[in-house]
Amino acid sequence: VLVRPCMRPDGFSSMLNIWMGSDFDGAFAQYVKVPANEVFPIESSWTNAELGSIPCSYGSAENMVQRSRVTSGEHVLVAGASGGVGSAVVQLAKVRGATVTAIVGKSKMDEVLRIGADFVVDRDSDIVSELGEECFDVVIDNVGGPHFAEELNTLKRGGRFASSGAIGGPLVNLDLRTMYLKDLTLIG
């Protein structure tokens, strides 16, 4: 079975939620006590570890892709595209008909192309020099860190930036003028 990691005791019309693994222990436990309506039977040849990655990775990815309103014909930049959430973002953006450029380490480039990215760029490169300014409709980043400002510069006017992580560092540089002069939307 799979257990919904973000439980909503008051239903989906309420923003009240309880996060398994944050609000209480048990996100990756072998046994956990939860309400029956938060449990979903699964028949699959996947291991428990493989199945256990789906709600977190794909749930986070779908939330960012949906909230940033990715649509067919748009160009999306995905930072951290070789990780669980990032690779899910690549696949979910492609399903919506977007063109996807992925930022990854050199050793992961072929794998990220295999899962659906149209283009890959080395995470150690100068992102703006490599990709150009104002070429993406959406940036989805679950890394944070030193590339944050560069990624904002790659957004077109009216672009959307979604973030769900900071493994590259939680403190970033931001020139506020980039945000308001380009009319960007930041989504957390």
Residue ranges of each PLM-predicted region?
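Conserved "cap/hinge" positions at secondary-structure junctions
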Residues: 3-5, 80, 104, 165
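Mid-domain Rossmann-like dinucleotide-binding core that forms the NAD(H)/NADP(H) cofactor-binding site
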Residues: 46-125
